[in-house]
Curated annotation (Swiss-Prot):
Family indicated by similarity: Belongs to the SPAN-X family.
Record's protein name: Sperm protein associated with the nucleus on the X chromosome N3
Protein source organism: Pan troglodytes
Disordered as annotated region, ranges: 1-140
Biased composition (Polar residues): 1-20, 62-79, 131-140
């Protein structure tokens, strides 16, 4: 029983360790080769940034809400001018209400257009009635 068996032989136990270390080295080499390629792919994707383009129409019809927002922004941009205007108005004796009235507070262009179109439509109706009666008499 004192004879060395394959499992108890020191050299044979060392040989599997050597083969394992050799396999480990071989496995490390392909990993090292793959690592630079992966890093190159990552840098290639970062070289091309994503660009978003947004176009806005200038001739687009503006809603009344947007118009009021734009005017409020204009007022907030130049608070110094507004204060100067108020200071001049007080020295002249005029009220601030007259100066504070801007295009947004008074009747807007759209309102005036609506009023004029309503008036013209009423006139057209009146004219249409008189014309209609004359046309009816002409057809008989």
């Amino acid at each position: 029983m004192e004879q060395p068996t394959s499992s108890t032989n020191g050299e044979k136990t060392k040989s599997p360790c050597k083969s394992n270390s050799e396999n480990d080295e071989m496995q490390e080499v392909p990993n090292r080769v793959l690592a630079p390629e992966q890093s190159l792919k990552k840098t290639k994707t970062s070289e091309y940034p994503i660009i978003f383009v947004y176009y806005r129409r200038k001739g687009k019809k503006i809603n009344s809400n947007q118009l009021e927002n734009d005017q409020s922004q204009e007022n907030s941009i130049n608070p110094v001018q507004k204060e100067e205007d108020e200071g001049l108005g007080l020295s002249e004796g005029s009220s601030n209400e007259d100066e504070d009235l801007g295009p947004s507070e008074g009747p807007s262009k759209e309102d005036k257009d609506l009023d004029s179109s309503e008036g013209s439509s009423q006139e057209n109706e009146d004219l249409g009635l008189s014309e209609g009666s004359s046309q009816d008499s002409g057809e008989d």
